[in-house]
């Protein structure tokens, strides 16, 4: 996907409610969210090709909200997963496919898309700037 400087880029935010089927400790939550998102890509050949292609995916997501004080996300509770992308088709995928998706630990419930208002960024903070996946798997297991 190539963006021209003169084109107004829209940023889509998807807020998804998810239900936990098992307790998940905070240091494993990124891995489980990634598995949840990845498993949805496998339901459609076009999205599977997108997933398997070695390229920037143009989306990011955060930790679940609310964060638990004891650092364990609880089985039986509903949390919010926020995903952002500049690709409208990808935003639609997250809204339509992920809500019907589930893995052993996570089940998607409902999602909504909104366009974030344009504003000038003064500072950018992120806890997960990039996730790297090699032929051997995700960076945490394959590179470190």
Task: Locate each region found by the language model.
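RNA-interacting cores
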Residues: 1-144
């Amino acid at each position: 996907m190539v963006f021209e400087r003169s084109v107004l880029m829209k940023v889509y935010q998807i807020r998804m409610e998810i239900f936990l089927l098992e307790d998940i400790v905070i240091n494993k939550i990124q891995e489980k969210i990634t598995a949840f998102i990845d498993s949805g890509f496998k339901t459609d050949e076009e999205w599977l090709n997108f997933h398997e292609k070695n390229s920037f995916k143009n989306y990011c997501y955060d930790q679940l909200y609310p964060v638990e004080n004891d650092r364990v996300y609880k089985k039986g509770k509903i949390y919010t997963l926020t995903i952002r992308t500049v690709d409208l088709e990808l935003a639609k995928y997250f809204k339509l496919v992920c809500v019907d998706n589930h893995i052993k630990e996570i089940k998607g419930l409902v999602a909504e898309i909104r366009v974030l208002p344009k504003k000038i960024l003064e500072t950018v903070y992120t806890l997960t700037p990039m996730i790297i996946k090699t032929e051997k798997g995700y960076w945490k297991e394959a590179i470190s």
